[in-house]
Amino acid sequence: MLSMLLPFGNSGVYASDVDREDRPEIAKLVQAFPTIEEDYHVVKLVGAGSFSSVFKAVDRHFDSYDNSYWISSQIEDQMPHDKTKRPKNHFVALKRIYATVLPSRIQTELEMLHELRGSDCVLNMITAVRHQDQVLIVLPFIQHAEFRDFYMKYSLPEIGAYLRDLLKGLAHIDAKGIIHRDIKPGNFAWNPYTQRGVILDFGLAQWQEADAPTENCCVDKLRKLKQEGKYYDYFPFEKTIADPPEGYLLHDPRPTKRADRAGTRGFRAPEVLFRCQNQTSSIDVWSVGVILLCFLTHRYPFFRCEDDIDAIVELAHIFGRNGMSNCALLHGQIWSDNIPTLLDQKHNWLDLIASITKNDENLILETSSDYQVALAIDLLDKLLELHPSKRVKAKTALQHEFFNACGVTRSGFEAENPFRSDFPSTVEQ
């Protein structure tokens, strides 16, 4: 999805410095919104995607309104502490959604952005403007750095600070009953100087279903359909393993396996790949685990799959044949392979990371204490849990001892720490 923020190198743009090469696109924006120049002076095209384009602009009437509802500590932190040295112009980001996007999709995004106001770790919507079939969302302008510029240099305490704000934002999103669906470094604006970050881009977000997945997930749903007479297994499970099907039904009454598969390749959870219909905010937590794996292995992106099948095979090489087989059954699917390099059991995280980074410099495993490394691996294991109902929640993950060991504040979530009793006491600090 499209990132709506500029990197540090472009943050010092003045109102008179309109980029020459961006003028045609800015002219199209002004043509689509004839009155936009009355409120905002557009200075730069940040980027454009399939569904939207984003511009940097000066808010002409910033001092005329009460901005306290969206001016978070994130915005304050990126400004000079001396108010007399603060820039005269206050920048915002203008996200223009193309008319080809379904109105219902635009409405959902606006409703979610409005509902999510109030968190320092989630991008707050300032306002929205509509002119005929054109919609413009006004958002805060936040300085950030590219993930590739710092992820290989970060120590465990710095990784902890990064994950703190990411998980805090996800906890807020989850509490509102929303699934982001596209958590990745490109959708988390991180400022390495202030050590703060915000989650952005809710173009794929969805409201979470009321029914959370059971321990047996899709299997329980299929059983319920059979009991209600809405599903009949014409080709029994036991027979399809031993023999090929004798034929195919002309009018098959069985429901097809349809589920939302939106997201970015390499960051989608196994239940998304197996087309589970009971997806929850746990898919966002899985994406956080992939980001942590990128930090620990110095590999980004870590997974380089081209399609869903390749993605499942990549996971199988880490979690083993047995793990993926059980995961598939959980979602009403069958996993079978003849890959000779595939092991039956899951790889040990420490061994995997060590083998990948053995020739790298600034190794986290060598520069951090054994206690911190062990806690990081334990957190990674809880984030990358194949079973969605057993995967740690974002709010619970914030209480993990890893953050305390790295000197990272737990961001105001004062729940009882559920990890103190289950983490091995044999690990020495």
From Swiss-Prot:
Keyword annotations: ATP-binding, Cell cycle, Cell division, Kinase, Meiosis, Nucleotide-binding, Nucleus, Phosphoprotein, Serine/threonine-protein kinase, Sporulation, Transferase
Residue span(s) of domain Protein kinase: 40-402
Active site (catalytic residues): D182
Keyword Electron transport: no
Coiled-coil portions: none
Class of enzymatic activity (EC top level): transferase
GO molecular function, one term: protein serine kinase activity
Reactions catalysed according to its record: L-seryl-[protein] + ATP = O-phospho-L-seryl-[protein] + ADP + H(+); L-threonyl-[protein] + ATP = O-phospho-L-threonyl-[protein] + ADP + H(+)
Name used for this protein in its record: Cell cycle protein kinase spo4
Species: Schizosaccharomyces pombe (strain 972 / ATCC 24843) (Fission yeast)
